[in-house]
Amino acid sequence: LQFGIHSLLFAETFLDKNLPLLDKCKAMGFDAVEIIPFDPDGFPAAKVRAAAADLGLTINTGYGMPEQYNVISPDPAIRQAGIDFSKKLIDLSNEAGAKVFGGMIYCGWGYLTGKMRTADEWRWGVDSYREIAAYAQQNSDLILGIEPVNRFESHFINTAADALRFIREVGLPNVKVHLDTFHMIREEDDFAGAVLEVGNQLGYVHACENQRGIPGSGLVPWQSFFQSLDSIGYDGCITIESFDPNMESIAKLCCIWRKLADSPEQLATEGLKFLRQAYSSVHAHQ
């Protein structure tokens, strides 16, 4: 099992000037870093790959699709733009040596119609993602992680069961479920049950408190969560995802209106210590 940290805790995007962040994350004790290339044309993918290899770090990538790249849009031109942009992000992820590309990569982030998901939207999403996943499969072993998110960010995939149905209908082995405890605590009826239901289709995990603070400081039932991860034999990456309210563009997108720790470094290091201890205590008793 690997423990990772999210680049958005420290930087609003990832450019050449942000490469020292990889050394910093390694020094804090992390095994992996998740990078969001919000400026894809400025993302130094090859340099990330080389630096990570030197440091012994695993790289994962993620994204929240803007509305102009929304593959469940009723506009076929927007859906096609989303497919094309997804392929570009997959190419960048491969160039950076990423193991997983996950997140809200299957519809527009914050796209809400004011109605329940429709059969047309589901079909558009599955058809688009089948093409995207087939493209990814041709070029690498990259895992695509479908992350269920809370109802305030999307009406499309809110639960582990939704994500499972989606990946089964896409039907390609490189598409997995990406669970995030921040969203789970808002949407799931049974924390451990959701993990057990996903089982071997779990490809990636975000470890976030219910309030986006230091893991262990809130309401997430970490013991039962880690017990269920252990039960299914999950051996992938668990990444702490949180954000700094001083980064205005990210804070606005993620609705972070207060300090969640004394510093991003405190959130990262104390969160890592808590998660390692929580996992070890469960794993030792299995």
Region spans (language model):
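Active-site-proximal loop/turn and secondary-structure-junction residues that shape catalytic pockets
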Residues: 9-11, 37-39, 65-67, 105-110, ...
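N-terminal substrate-binding region of glycoside hydrolase catalytic domains
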Residues: 22-42, 68
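Active-site-adjacent beta->alpha loops and helix N-cap segments on the catalytic face
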Residues: 41-51
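Active-site acidic/histidine proton-transfer and metal-coordination neighborhood
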Residues: 53-54, 76-176, 258, 262-266, ...
